[in-house]
């Protein structure tokens, strides 16, 4: 019995070490969102223009809502701190990410999705080449595993909605399209 307990502890510490995170880019005490509760987080996320009651009554599971924020607002600066291409590059450098499982590279060519993934571990030089030279979109799955800021935001949403919240980051070069036009049946946030 003692050996299995020791192995269990060792396995759990290994899994905690497996995910390495880059440095935090923003002081959490200067958050734009209110993180007191899941409700206050979601209310501050959708903004005062709509409000939570109107959102739930008129939009939730009924129709899409597009919220456009003024470029001069603190919101834009805050969102820029949540995730960036530089953060992704650092994550790729310090973690053993896998194509398909953690990250995809793709581009729309003649109305068809072209995949740039390789087999095995993600290599930063390949991602950089595909993004910069081939204008491929980077799709990064579950970024909250590597970003405490995103994890905190998603955790509050999960608490408020009492449901799991999925997250992907799509980074697409200017004048490019990574995926064909499609209709999503879930909440989508675009920055």
Where does each model-flagged region fall?
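Short hydrophobic/aromatic beta-strand or adjacent loop that forms the aromatic wall/cage
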Residues: 64
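Structured beta-strand/turn binding interfaces of compact recognition modules in eukaryotic regulators
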Residues: 70
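Active-site region of the double-stranded beta-helix
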Residues: 18-50, 56-58, 73, 80-81, ...
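Positively charged, lysine/arginine-rich intrinsically disordered segments
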Residues: 6-8, 13, 20
């Amino acid at each position: 019995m003692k050996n299995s307990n020791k192995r269990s502890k060792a396995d759990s510490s290994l899994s905690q070490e497996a995910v390495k995170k880059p440095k935090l880019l923003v002081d959490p005490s200067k958050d734009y969102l209110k993180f007191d509760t899941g409700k206050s987080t979601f209310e501050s996320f959708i903004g005062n223009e709509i409000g939570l009651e109107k959102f739930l009554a008129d939009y939730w599971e009924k129709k899409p809502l597009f919220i456009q924020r003024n470029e001069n607002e603190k919101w834009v600066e805050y969102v820029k701190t949540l995730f960036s291409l530089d953060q992704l590059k650092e994550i790729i450098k310090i973690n053993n990410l896998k194509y398909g499982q953690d990250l995809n590279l793709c581009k729309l060519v003649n109305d068809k999705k072209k995949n740039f993934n390789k087999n095995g571990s993600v290599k930063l030089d390949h991602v950089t080449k595909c993004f910069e030279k081939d204008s491929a979109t980077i799709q990064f799955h579950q970024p909250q595993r590597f970003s405490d800021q995103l994890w905190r935001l998603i955790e509050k949403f999960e608490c408020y909605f009492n449901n799991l919240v999925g997250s992907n980051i799509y980074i697409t070069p200017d004048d490019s399209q990574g995926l064909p036009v499609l209709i999503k049946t879930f909440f989508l946030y675009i920055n």
